[in-house]
Amino acid sequence: MLPLGEVKLTRKIQSLSIIFRTNTNIEIWDQNKKRIFEKPKIEYALRCLNSVIKSIKKTKELMPDTLIKFQVIDDNSSDENLKKLKDLINTHSIESEIINHDKSEHKEKIAAENNQETFGNLSSLLKCFEVAKKDQSDLIYFVEDDYLHYEHSLVDMLNTYERVSSQHKDEIIVCPSDYPFNYMNNEKTNILIGSQQHWRTITKMLCTFMISKKMFQKHIENFDKTCEKRHEPFEKYLNKILESEIGISPIKSLAIHMTNVNSSYGLSPFIDIKKLWEENKIRQ
């Protein structure tokens, strides 16, 4: 980017751990609404998993020195659905680990919930955080099974992380989605230049985000509190991190949250969602 001059990259990424959290049995947690395209949940999980794997392969091609670890945390999928997930991973010949999570292991750590789906959601998220605590990767990307990625998404996120954190001289949080709720109030934001597009600072996030192991450890209490019980909003303690740290999201979106068309947490603006959806169809 010639007009911007040279940015000296002092924060180089050596390794990335991707923790993909899936539950193929619940259509939309905490809602009765239908997702865009109104397909069974397994279809979203498969296409979103496919998109993430394609993005991993592109990253390995363009950034061969960056080590990538891929883990799937599965929350009680049926044998049939779990086989579909495994078959897709095997088709891509990508190294991975699938962890079959049993939510009963957290019955002493999470407050009892009237809704078992809520308990399961908290438990699988806590499992992701527990896995991350043991991980030694430079960056950790927590990603849910209803985020549809572009092939170039991970490369852009990693390059932007290096650029912005080098300029900021500190760690940052990178969210892949341009959520509608970012535009629903008069909140001021800063516009930044990433590797390929503009980004904006944010004060709210959901449970799909990229964070350094260093920052994750720094705010470990917030991550633990997030899963102790159902908060309002759900991400209350994640958002508290953004009160003292810089978080950014892309303009335009690098991953689409495949929710209901009217959800403020969902479909990003100015994206050909149908095209991206079809590009990630699983070919039998």
Language-model features: locations:
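Active-site-proximal specificity loops/subdomain of glycosyltransferases
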Residues: K33, S78-S137
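Short, flexible/disordered intra-domain loops and linkers
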Residues: E27-E43, I110-E117, F223-E228
